[in-house]
Amino acid sequence: MKIINLDSKNLASFYVACELFKQIQQHPHAKLGLATGGTMTDVYHYLVNLLIKNKVDVSQVETFNLDEYVGLKASHQQSYHTYMNKVLFEQYPHFVKNHIHIPDGLSENLEAEAERYNNLLDERGPIDIQILGIGENGHIGFNEPGTDFNSETHVVNLTESTIKANSRFFDNEKDVPRQAVSMGVKSILKAKRIILLAFGPKKKEAISKLLNEQVTEDVPATILHTHPNVEVYVDDEAAPDCL
């Protein structure tokens, strides 16, 4: 595991955007694993600028999102479909629609949807670069503490801490979905390369646990120590004192 401590969120986001850009530029059939949330917004901003500036052909690129809330329409302002459209796919409208993959949180059979998405990952993968955030409780994707490390794409019951953390995006906490469809830990580890980002003082404890604890399901991110190609980008506020 390689730790990259940069001065600011903006600088770290730019570095990660450059890594995604290079993957697309050098490998036109790149398969990218994408994440959502405030941590990722600047990454996509810089990536879009690089794609526009260089007029990059992305028609063969495939994207696979980590997760989606259960119960939200794709058009809902807080769905991850809407997020991805706003920050990437509408900003650089050259990605092919059927190459964009996001779980369907409105499926009538969520278990079948999880299986469908998992089969898609197996058929179309492996993912070249998977980007990840980390929750304050050490979750990756929506794989909460206690998640089986052998889990593949599955339906997740969100913890109260995750619901509270995500409530800032909703009018009030009761509007936050209680479930999500998420890639499992085993699914994430199939990626050839993983880049995790963590910014701000609220992520400092999670990064400290990631770096200092043994591999444990109590801190899902610790499983990344078993992967041969992981980079962790942190800003000064998220960097633990040991760095």
Swiss-Prot record:
Database matches in CDD domains: GlcN6P_deaminase
Top EC class of this enzyme: hydrolase
GO cellular component: cytoplasm
Listed InterPro entries: Glc/Gal-6P_isomerase (IPR006148), Glucosamine6P_isomerase (IPR004547), Glucosamine6P_isomerase_CS (IPR018321), NagB/RpiA_transferase-like (IPR037171)
Active site (UniProt): 67 (proton acceptor), 137 (for ring-opening step), 139 (proton acceptor), 144 (for ring-opening step)
Pfam families hit by this protein: Glucosamine_iso
Gene Ontology molecular function terms on file: glucosamine-6-phosphate deaminase activity; identical protein binding
Pathway: Amino-sugar metabolism; N-acetylneuraminate degradation; D-fructose 6-phosphate from N-acetylneuraminate: step 5/5
Name of the protein: Glucosamine-6-phosphate deaminase
Organism, scientific name: Staphylococcus epidermidis (strain ATCC 12228 / FDA PCI 1200)
Source species taxonomy: Bacteria, Bacillati, Bacillota, Bacilli, Bacillales
